[in-house]
Amino acid sequence: RAKTALAAWAHNEAVPLVSVGAAGGKRRAEAMQIADLAEVTHDPLLAQLRYRLRKHHGAARQGRMGTLCVFSREAVAPPDASCGLDTSDGSLNCHGFGSVVAVTAAFGFAAAGCLMDTLVNTNLQKVGGAFKTPKNHATI
């Protein structure tokens, strides 16, 4: 819910935002991709974000949504049964799947780089403590 609130605020205030999807159970950092939230697949965390933005915040149902996302279409690797982990809570956290630092770090670095690129290539004006794009400039 916090991610949804942040994304809704960023969209309403025309502040660039890069969101990061689920890394739990992923092993291949090189499989990471960056796309608009509307184009993301194979990521339940970002699917939930997309659903909540559309249902509760009036986000576009067709075309781009304006939130860039770092994600992976790699299938989640289930935990090794010999580890004896309880994975029954059904939540979207890494519990039971674990995470690989190479994947989480790559996601974070990609998000930071994407946001820096967006800020450098967007004519932003600081207004009232928040960055806003000029009225004649398309948002991401």
Question: What name fits each language-model region?
Answer:
Residues 1-35:
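ADP-ribose/adenylate-binding Rossmann-like module
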